[in-house]
């Protein structure tokens, strides 16, 4: 099996890396700022590099990965949130993931990442189509 590598943004407790590792995919790095979740991820993946604050990560300078996963903050997207969408103070961090993906693509001649997986609430479908089209990215049909 090829060595498929994964990077996780807004990593939390490392659910994406854990699931991926059970499928033979190797988690390489993660970005998270909360200490408690990082301690859990370090226990499961002691060799995974922790990049810290997503706003300070340069996607062109980190190790390229085949897959980038992210579950950006949903406070402004959720049913109980204020529904200000991707313009909201917390949910707008979503754009940091897109920036990192684009920086990595630019640095690798569009080879990496091959796949980006975003997890969030159902309201996000109303916000995302415009962003995906603007960035020439595909989206699964509803």
Report residues per predicted region.
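Conserved active-site and SAM-binding loop architecture
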Residues: 1-142
């Amino acid at each position: 099996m090829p060595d498929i590598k994964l990077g996780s943004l807004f990593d939390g407790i490392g659910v994406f890396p854990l699931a991926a590792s059970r499928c033979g995919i190797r988690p390489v790095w993660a970005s998270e700022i909360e200490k408690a979740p990082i301690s859990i991820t370090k226990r499961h993946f002691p060799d995974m590099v922790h990049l810290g604050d997503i706003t300070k990560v340069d996607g062109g300078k980190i190790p390229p990965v085949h897959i980038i996963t992210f579950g950006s903050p949903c406070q402004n997207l959720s049913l109980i949130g204020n529904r200000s969408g991707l313009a909201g103070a917390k949910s707008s961090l979503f754009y940091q993931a897109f920036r990192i993906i684009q920086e990595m693509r630019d640095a690798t001649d569009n080879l990496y990442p091959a796949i980006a997986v975003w997890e969030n609430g159902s309201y996000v479908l109303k916000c995302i189509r415009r962003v995906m089209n603007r960035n020439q990215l595909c989206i699964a049909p509803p």
